[in-house]
Amino acid sequence: KNGQTTSGSVNVVSGTTSYSLTLSFVSSTLNNNEWSVIKSVSDAGQGANYWSIGDRKAVTLNGTVGKLSLSNVTTYAFIIGFNHNASVEGANRIHFQLAKTALSGGTDVCFCDNQYGPDSGWSSPGAGYFVMNASNTNSGGWKSSQMRTNICGTSLSSYSGTIIAVIPAALRAVLKSVTKYTDNTGGGSDTASYVTSTTDLLPLLSEFEYH
């Protein structure tokens, strides 16, 4: 129970054949489940039958994201949707957002570095900080932004210095990608052909998703 698993074997009536089984026991309390169990439920497309939007699970962060160092910082990921835009983004997904400060109640967490402060005219702090790009440009759009490549992370095999690096290994092992469509050219022109797809593991919400 409570998101644990067990293994065993089952003998058929004839007694001549056996099958190995791994049983996953799913808790209706999201935080009581291992990430591997949550993935199994997601794979089966059954997330909404066990949990609800807003349910939370503890995520302890360790390591460095850009210029921000984190040491045993416990936050709470929360569900924001099940199979959102499945025909476009990918099926059998449970969509989470980072993060809240508590398992219930609490406040939203905003990750920032030592360059955060009042906006007195934009001056680039350079690469590796929590800015969309290292200079005042949107060339290349979301796809080429330093926020996507250097802060959020795009790879499960090369992720040093990104958010992917600081989440628990158990969570990293079950991350699923989604397909996002954004303007990946930039320059301010409202041109439909500029909208192309990217494969993302930890995307930012779009303006319309926030609203």
Question: What are the functions of these language-model segments?
Answer:
Residues K1-N2, S14, L61, L70:
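Structural motif
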Residues N2-S24:
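Structured interaction patches on ligand/partner-binding surfaces of diverse proteins
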Residues V26-H211:
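Collagenous Gly-X-Y triple-helix signature in extracellular proteins
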